[in-house]
Amino acid sequence: MSHRRAVFAAVLQLIACSGGTLVAHHSFSMFEMDKNVTYEGVVVEYMWVNPHTHFTVDIKTGPDVDPATVGRWDVEGGSTNIMARQGWTRATLKPGERITLVGHPMKDGSKGISLFYMIRPDGKRLYHDIARPKDEASQ
């Protein structure tokens, strides 16, 4: 086998072996990204982990709450790196804190939300990512 073919075969093998990791990260296609909902709730758990931060919130009130939405919700944020650039830390949330969530609901209606931003009791907004309205860039 020529050197060129050996290199080509090695590259193909490397691509084939890493294929699982290339597609392992899910997209946000499970969320209704063109729809925002607002819920108020109490933090149950906050997980500062990669690939996405997660927290669990007991939802009881909010402008978009009906009896079907009351309950424990899983909230998905960005990676710890992305969240840190938005002002989040490992200590941002504590169980028992009351917060307001604005985000994108699951398409299948299950109790999950992709975070757009959170409003703390002091009124401060913390965003999931850098995408935010220009008039709120300094908040």
Language model segments and positions:
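Short, structured beta-strand/loop micro-motifs enriched in basic residues and often containing a Trp
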Residues: 76-85
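Conserved hydrophobic positions within beta-strands
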Residues: 41-43, 98
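OB-fold/S1-family single-stranded nucleic acid-binding modules
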Residues: 106-130
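Bacterial N-terminal signal peptides that target proteins for export
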Residues: 1-11
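Short aromatic-glycine-enriched beta-strand elements
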Residues: 49-62
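Short boundary/loop segments of OB/S1/cold-shock single-stranded nucleic-acid-binding domains
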Residues: 23-37
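Bacterial N-terminal signal peptides
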Residues: 9-21
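Short nucleic-acid-contacting surface segments enriched for D/E, G, S/T with interspersed K/R
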Residues: 85-100
